Regions:
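Flexible mid-to-C-terminal extensions adjoining Fe-S/redox cofactors in radical SAM and related proteins
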Residues: 51, 58-148
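Short, small/polar residue-rich loop motifs at catalytic or cofactor-binding pockets
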Residues: 36-39
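Short, acidic, Ser/Thr-enriched surface-loop or helix-capping motifs
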Residues: 46
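Short, flexible cytosolic linker that couples an ABC transmembrane/permease module to its adjacent nucleotide-binding
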Residues: 28-32
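Flexible glycine/acidic-rich beta-alpha junction loops that bind and position SAM and/or redox cofactors
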Residues: 14-26, 56-62
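Single conserved hydrophobic/aromatic residue that forms the stacking wall/gate
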Residues: 1-13
Length: 148
């Protein structure tokens, strides 16, 4: 079991930083819902000045948002990304991990399903496992502190 490895081995813990999720703090609720902010809060800028919602969409003409001279001219792409969040995906509605993954990565969803609003199932399963392991590690850490 992954969590047993993580709890039982300092070396394994150092090598598994992706399981180190801040369960008690973390981002504000807005970021927990909206995720990374691709296409709305930040954009990828190419060496030629083109603007894309994320580096993973660079070169795809469908996702070209504009350029650094004219700004965002393709507002439809921005609006599409604005609605990419934990509550916009019906599949996320009842998921216990939605406020940790924020609905997942739009680029991963696009590559898996052809839509930025799709759901990358393998990514969901991996993220839920990360959260489970983080919870297990937190419980073990708190237990070790309590037991001296």
């Amino acid at each position: 079991e992954i969590s047993e490895c993580l709890v039982g081995s300092e070396m394994c813990i150092r090598d598994s930083y992706h399981y180190m999720i801040d369960l008690t703090g973390g981002p504000c609720i807005y970021k927990r819902i909206s995720g990374c902010g691709s296409g709305t809060e930040y954009m990828a800028v190419t060496p030629w000045g083109d603007l894309y919602p994320c580096h993973q969409f660079v070169g795809d003409p469908k996702y070209l948002m504009g350029d650094i001279w004219k700004g965002v001219t393709n507002t439809a792409v921005r609006d599409e990304f604005k609605h990419c969040n934990a509550y916009a995906r019906p599949e996320c509605k009842d998921c216990w991990a939605k406020l940790y993954c924020s609905g997942g990565c739009a680029a991963n969803a696009f590559h898996a399903t052809g839509s930025i609003r799709g759901v990358y199932e393998a990514g969901c399963e991996l993220f839920r496992k990360r959260i489970e392991c983080a919870i297990m590690m937190k419980v073990a850490e708190d237990s070790a502190k309590a037991n001296g």
